Swiss-Prot record:
Residues with Phosphoserine modification: S57, S60, S69, S101, S152, S175, S179, S216, S217, S254, S330, S344, S390
Source species taxonomy: Eukaryota, Metazoa, Chordata, Craniata, Vertebrata
Source organism per UniProt: Homo sapiens
Organs and tissues of expression: Expressed in chronic myeloid leukemia cells, adrenal gland, brain, cerebellum, kidney, lung, mammary gland and testis. Weakly or not expressed in other tissues.
CDD domains: AdoMet_MTases
Biased composition (Basic residues): 258-269, 360-369
Biased composition (Low complexity): 52-84, 338-359
Function: S-adenosyl-L-methionine-dependent methyltransferase that adds a methylphosphate cap at the 5'-end of 7SK snRNA (7SK RNA), leading to stabilize it. Also has a non-enzymatic function as part of the 7SK RNP complex: the 7SK RNP complex sequesters the positive transcription elongation factor b (P-TEFb) in a large inactive 7SK RNP complex preventing RNA polymerase II phosphorylation and subsequent transcriptional elongation. The 7SK RNP complex also promotes snRNA gene transcription by RNA polymerase II via interaction with the little elongation complex (LEC).
Sites of the Glycyl lysine isopeptide (Lys-Gly) (interchain with G-Cter in SUMO2) crosslink: K643
Gene3D superfamilies from the UniProt entry: Vaccinia Virus protein VP39
Region (Disordered): 1-167, 258-314, 332-407
Binding-site list for S-adenosyl-L-methionine: Y422, R433, G451, C452, N453, D474, I475, N559, Y560, L581
Protein name, UniProt field: 7SK snRNA methylphosphate capping enzyme
Amino acid sequence: MIEMAAEKEPFLVPAPPPPLKDESGGGGGPTVPPHQEAASGELRGGTERGPGRCAPSAGSPAAAVGRESPGAAATSSSGPQAQQHRGGGPQAQSHGEARLSDPPGRAAPPDVGEERRGGGGTELGPPAPPRPRNGYQPHRPPGGGGGKRRNSCNVGGGGGGFKHPAFKRRRRVNSDCDSVLPSNFLLGGNIFDPLNLNSLLDEEVSRTLNAETPKSSPLPAKGRDPVEILIPKDITDPLSLNTCTDEGHVVLASPLKTGRKRHRHRGQHHQQQQAAGGSESHPVPPTAPLTPLLHGEGASQQPRHRGQNRDAPQPYELNTAINCRDEVVSPLPSALQGPSGSLSAPPAASVISAPPSSSSRHRKRRRTSSKSEAGARGGGQGSKEKGRGSWGGRHHHHHPLPAAGFKKQQRKFQYGNYCKYYGYRNPSCEDGRLRVLKPEWFRGRDVLDLGCNVGHLTLSIACKWGPSRMVGLDIDSRLIHSARQNIRHYLSEELRLPPQTLEGDPGAEGEEGTTTVRKRSCFPASLTASRGPIAAPQVPLDGADTSVFPNNVVFVTGNYVLDRDDLVEAQTPEYDVVLCLSLTKWVHLNWGDEGLKRMFRRIYRHLRPGGILVLEPQPWSSYGKRKTLTETIYKNYYRIQLKPEQFSSYLTSPDVGFSSYELVATPHNTSKGFQRPVYLFHKARSPSH
């Protein structure tokens, strides 16, 4: 607009107001373009020189020179006009821009900031340098021009304005450089991957990094651990829920520990002793085993010596590991000190052939056991009936107690009340004694089972052979509680079977028929094994048939051995059949000969005329292993005179009164220690007393 007006005719523009003195250095005034500055200069020039002189137009060369180069205008112009072009007058430019217009090295004019007024206009000199405000002098870059603007905040205190926190001011003022990011990474990574995890994707890089030390996790080798795939035998039943329907073949979800790892060195040591003692000469029949001469437990230990039936649980393994080892090695020190050279040489050879660790361990055991049993083996000669052979007899007057003492954990089972007795006697099959017992002995009879334990055999007889009443007696209340709970398991078995199979023919043929039907059962046996029986507890009902299972079975806690003989005389007949299976040893050890005789006499008086006693005695060779359970058992063991092989003669003597007896059979068992003969004693129909 101004240029267009200048081309046509000159016109007057009022001069801008002079800048304030306190804002002269701030550069905050209005900015006037160069053509306006030239125009105002011309107006002032015309006013000073007179109205007759014409001002150059905006399009003239002089005006163009004045717009393009203030320095050139200063040379061509004179006086105040040149100062006007250099100083910038009404532009109120900043001090930085004013310095750009001056040549380098030129000093400021002496009339800086001085106002000169003409006749019709106002002339302004170069702007004054900025005045310090609030005690802070802004920093000027040395090279001139605009640099990075610093934060103009108050640090000196006093004065107004916004103030930042002190710690931020100090950090900003004192920091000369920006933060430096890390560049050296020990694992070879970068700022985005400091741990160099991406290198694990490359197997070659991973192998290179881990050549010396595993600085980073290596990649897993492919195919190092092959995946095992188990293919089930029956693809339609991969979990084998319907395959094992027989209770004997049920595999529990959490199987019981067999305890074989505790005795892993015992079998090897027994074999060495047996090989060493095979050349010894003993006045024993050829059919008798050698091991009873060492520890008196040959019947139950022979399978271990020959290495047979390793998987089957062995008897009395639950709490007698220390006693078994002590008694096995106890005769060796006496043999070494004995007068016979033939007895001392073989044990020495066995010690030398054993490994160093095992031999040192057994040597310590020998020293301990020799002190405890030196008196028991030393002295005069003993009889062969004691089961000690030619290893020396025993004095009945002096038997020192074992140095190891009697442990409470062993005392817990001093009556043979093992809670898992049937577990290691019949690990995967039914009780072998059921095959030698005849159903006609029990059908419709009153039966008493002494030492029933958890009642498996008692419940089997009550369920299969239909006795009129079946009473299970045991001295341990915990076993009786378990026996009562087991009734539900047998009821669950009946629920699994079809109704027509419940009434089968007795005997072996009936058992086989029942087994065939059980295999066709579709109920998962694993559910019963893991979750318990599915049958509800039985509620006694009035008028129910007491001869039908489970109403015909009851379990009672009590001690069958009476304290005095006069109590035996008061016993009245109540039962037709009495079962005494694997009980005589525990009665013998806890109550001696007198207690066992009282039990036999009470059984005879408890039977009705024509009744029978089913007896399964333990052999004398199994007594010695249990003699250290308690102090009472230890003393009774050396006082026993009535041996198991004499039971038949005593029961048929006038002291008891049985009329006859017979050997039924010797049931087969995986452990020869449980292969015990079963005898049947008959009570006369017209008793003599």
